[in-house]
Amino acid sequence: MAELQMLLEEEIPSGKRALIESYQNLTRVADYCENNYIQATDKRKALEETKAYTTQSLASVAYQINALANNVLQLLDIQASQLRRMESSINHISQTVDIHKEKVARREIGILTTNKNTSRTHKIIAPANMERPVRYIRKPIDYTVLDDVGHGVKHGNNQPARTGTLSRTNPPTQKPPSPPVSGRGTLGRNTPYKTLEPVKPPTVPNDYMTSPARLGSQHSPGRTASLNQRPRTHSGSSGGSGSRENSGSSSIGIPIAVPTPSPPTAGPAAPGAAPGSQYGTMTRQISRHNSTTSSTSSGGYRRTPSVTAQFSAQPHVNGGPLYSQNSISIAPPPPPMPQLTPQIPLTGFVARVQENIADSPTPPPPPPPDDIPMFDDSPPPPPPPPVDYEDEEAAVVQYSDPYADGDPAWAPKNYIEKVVAIYDYTKDKDDELSFKEGAIIYVIKKNDDGWFEGVCNRVTGLFPGNYVESIMHYTD
């Protein structure tokens, strides 16, 4: 406060007086310099003296103005601080008044209320009678409690080992996720999937059925041939569909002897064979001691040597006479299918054997009974008597590829492999393929997601890889 008073009473008024005096002195100095320049003989010296007076006068006036301005700014700062202190005091007083008003209001509100008596009790009340601890009694673990829970297959429903039924595995219940619709223009699978669509299981053709009634051993005239032992490895099915073998088969990796078949002779063919069939048949011959049991089926499944099923009794639907490797003529398309004839597709472990064997024609198998059920759920027939594997000769697997001698005109020039469809598939998207069982597809690209890109009947598209199986040709 004293500093403010000193500024207002002493320093600021003295600064004003100094400025007024400087103004008067500047007027006198100007008059002197003018007269001196006019009267002096040495004009140059007079000019230099005038410059010196001018510089000194301006410096003196500037100093006085600076001192007065600093005093005024200091005065303003002191007054601003005093205003802030006054504002703080006023705010404190207003808050005190508000607190007093709130206290008075609460007191007035409390007068209008009534007192309430509350009894305080403990939140947790201990029980009057303590519970006695239960004695631990060990109970044995029952491992069969969860046997009937879930969708598992019971152990009792498994088929006995080495049954004679020629069963067929179900189509895979899952396929690779369908490609997104955005990839319609291109056949690439590089674009990430957005939403996985539910998987539609493939449909099973109605013409598949087991033939329990045909399990009787059909004896045919014995065949003698020189056997070449060749180990055959099992080809697992693709797409998680499990093993292609029957669940009861126990000789998957047993080497079997492959006799060398002779080229077709001019003798009479079997009555059930279609002479112009384009597809081949798979013949399995099993020789035991002095009798030979032959079973003919139009499929590509690997069977154990103990299989004695006669599966194709009527005229061959999907096959015809066995063509040798030297046959070059292209056969006409296969005859129409009878509706009730059981059919096995050209799948499985497909082989083409180029060998020679002296073979005599076998009598045709008997016609099938009329009461064969479709997909019979009855228990399988009892297994045949055990076979001595040392005296048993292995089966011959022959398959005539319709495109073995040359690829068709619509086949691509460069492809990864040639596959055969083992299930029917109907396309879900526009860039996919639709094909029937037994169709030949040329794979031109394999994607990491399980989908293949291939050509079938002049149509290029995508298809799940677990619906096809590779065609492998064996040569000597």
Swiss-Prot record:
GO terms for biological process: cell projection morphogenesis; dendrite morphogenesis; lamellipodium morphogenesis; megakaryocyte development; neuron migration; postsynapse to nucleus signaling pathway; somitogenesis. The modification Phosphothreonine is found at residues 169, 173, 210, 475. Its main location: cytoplasm. The modification N-acetylalanine is found at residue 2. Residues 243-253, 267-277 have a biased composition (Low complexity). It is found in: Cytoplasm; Nucleus; Cell projection, Lamellipodium; Cell projection, Filopodium. It holds the Pfam family Abi_HHR. Residues 150-280, 312-343, 356-387 are annotated as: Disordered. Changing residue 53 to A: Not phosphorylated and perinuclear upon NMDA treatment. Residues 156-170, 217-230 have a biased composition (Polar residues). The modification Phosphoserine is found at residues 178, 182, 211, 217, 220, 287, 291, 434. SUPFAM superfamilies: SH3-domain (SSF50044). Residues 45-107 form the t-SNARE coiled-coil homology domain. One of its GO terms (cellular component) is SCAR complex. Residues 414-473 form the SH3 domain. The keyword Coiled coil applies. GO terms for molecular function: protein tyrosine kinase activator activity; SH3 domain binding; signaling adaptor activity. Residues 361-371, 378-387 have a biased composition (Pro residues). Interacts with ABL1, ENAH, STX1A, SNAP25, VAMP2, EPS8, SOS1, SOS2, GRB2, SPTA1, NCKAP1/NAP1, the first SH3 domain of NCK1 and through its N-terminus with WASF1. Part of a complex consisting of ABI1, STX1A and SNAP25. Part of a complex consisting of ABI1, EPS8 and SOS1. Component of the WAVE2 complex composed of ABI1, CYFIP1/SRA1, NCKAP1/NAP1 (NCKAP1l/HEM1 in hematopoietic cells) and WASF2/WAVE2. Interacts (via SH3 domain) with SHANK2 and SHANK3, but not SHANK1; the interaction is direct. Interacts with the heterodimer MYC:MAX; the interaction may enhance MYC:MAX transcriptional activity. May act in negative regulation of cell growth and transformation by interacting with nonreceptor tyrosine kinases ABL1 and/or ABL2. May play a role in regulation of EGF-induced Erk pathway activation. Involved in cytoskeletal reorganization and EGFR signaling. Together with EPS8 participates in transduction of signals from Ras to Rac. In vitro, a trimeric complex of ABI1, EPS8 and SOS1 exhibits Rac specific guanine nucleotide exchange factor (GEF) activity and ABI1 seems to act as an adapter in the complex. Regulates ABL1/c-Abl-mediated phosphorylation of ENAH. The t-SNARE coiled-coil homology domain is necessary and sufficient for interaction with STX1A. Belongs to the ABI family. PANTHER family: ABL INTERACTOR 1, ABL INTERACTOR FAMILY MEMBER. This is Abl interactor 1. It comes from Rattus norvegicus (Rat).
